[in-house]
Amino acid sequence: MAGAKEIRSKIGSVKSTQKITKAMEMVAASKMRRSQESMAASRPYADTMRKVIGHLALGNLEYRHPYLEEREAKRVGYIIISSDRGLCGGLNINLFKKVMAGMKTWSEDGVEIDLAVIGSKATAFFNSYGGNVIAQNSGLGDKPSLEELIGTVGVMLKKYDEGQLDRLYVVNNKFINTMVQEPTIDQLLPLPKSEDEAMKRTHAWDYIYEPEPKPLLDALLIRYVESQVYQGVVENLACEHVARMIAMKAATDNAGDIIDELQLVYNKARQSAITQELSEIVSGASAV
C-alpha cells in the first residue's frame, strides 16, 4: 500500500484537476446559452428559406435552374462541420462515423467524393483519413459569421456549376435538446422537394417573379445554400458547448469519486501506520 504522504499528494493533484474541469464546465454552460440564443435567432430564417425553396422545387417554373435538376450521381460533395476544439465527448467522432458510412455507400457504387471541411477537428481527421479535401476552414470562434463561410461554400458551388459535382450535402450535429445532439446529413443540391404534405396537397398556386425568375433564382438559391451551411455551423457550435459541459461535469463527478476512494485508502494507510507504531511501542515496553 502506498504511503500516506504519497496518497495525500495524489488527492491534492486530483483536487486541482477537479477545479479545472469545474471551471471548464461553467464556461461551457455560459457559452452554451449564448450559442443557443444565436441558433434560435437564425433558425426561423433558415427554416423559412427551406420552405420557400422547397416550394420552388415543387413549382412549374418557366426557368429551370440547374440546382433544381436531378442528374446521375457520378461525383458527390460533402460540407462537413465539426468543432475547432476537443474535450466534447464523442460529438465529433460520432459525426465522422456517420459521414464515413455515407461515403462508403457512394464509394461502393463507384462514385467519387470531394470534401469541404469546417473546423480543425474535421480538417485533421479527413486529411489523416485520406479524403479528397478541396476546401477547409477553421478558427471561426464562438461568433461565426456568414462572410467567413462564403469562400468554402463557393468552392463547392463552383464545382457543382461546372458539372464536377452531382450532389452536395451538409453534415453537422443538430441540436435537439441539452441531452441529445444528433449527427445529420442533409442534401443541399439538387434542391430537395418539400416534405410538407400540406404544401403538396394545396400546391395550386405559384410565386410571381419580378422582374425575371432567372436573376432572382440565381441569387436566392445561392443564399439558400449559404444559409443552410451557416445554420449548420451555429447548431454544431451549440452542440459543442453542450457536449463539453456534459463531459466536464462527468469529469468533475469522476474526480470527486476518485478523491473519496483515495481518502479511504489514505485513512487506512494512516490507521495502519498508527497501529504499527503502537505495536512497536508496546513491544519496546515489554522488552524493558
Swiss-Prot record:
One of its GO terms (cellular component) is plasma membrane. InterPro entries: ATP_synth_F1_ATPase_gsu, ATP_synth_F1_gsu, ATP_synth_F1_gsu_CS. Pfam families: ATP-synt. One of its GO terms (molecular function) is ATP binding. One of its GO terms (biological process) is proton motive force-driven plasma membrane ATP synthesis. Keywords: ATP synthesis, Cell inner membrane, Cell membrane, CF(1), Hydrogen ion transport, Ion transport, Membrane, Transport. The keyword Transferase does not apply. Signal peptide: none annotated. CDD domains: F1-ATPase_gamma. It is found in: Cell inner membrane. It is a peripheral membrane protein. Its main location: membrane. Belongs to the ATPase gamma chain family. F-type ATPases have 2 components, CF(1) - the catalytic core - and CF(0) - the membrane proton channel. CF(1) has five subunits: alpha(3), beta(3), gamma(1), delta(1), epsilon(1). CF(0) has three main subunits: a, b and c. HAMAP family: ATP_synth_gamma_bact. Produces ATP from ADP in the presence of a proton gradient across the membrane. The gamma chain is believed to be important in regulating ATPase activity and the flow of protons through the CF(0) complex. This is ATP synthase gamma chain. It comes from Aliivibrio salmonicida (strain LFI1238).
